[in-house]
Amino acid sequence: MTDFCSIDGRLTPLGEGLPGGVYLYQRLRTVDYRPLHTAAHLSRLRDGAGSLFGRPAELPAGRIADEIGALLRANGYPAGGATVTLRLYADGTYALTADGVSLYRTYALRSLRPAAAVVPCDGYRPEWPTSARREMAR
């Protein structure tokens, strides 16, 4: 399956490459194909572009949100949590790349893990000593 990126709103095979040059970026979390806190992310990019590139960027939040949804669907991402990187280049070009599916639907502490599936099984050699048997014998 081809991975896609979005450059200035156009879906493009990722293999064709992203624009080169200096850029600012924000990584956005998404839930069900919609980015979270889009306005805050775009505000940071606008401020950074004004400071570093000498001109603020015009990135409409609604259009960016729609493009993120289209990008995730084009890449075959399931509904749920995912991460997307928005790059803003010095010339005003922007690019979106899908970075991966998340186990979590929203923000979560990285030290938290989903509940593990536990499958009971016997050891290869039941007569061999194990730490569990030693503890049970005490």
Label each region the model flagged:
Residues M1-A74, G81-T83, Y89-R138:
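Helix-start/capping segments and mature chain N-termini
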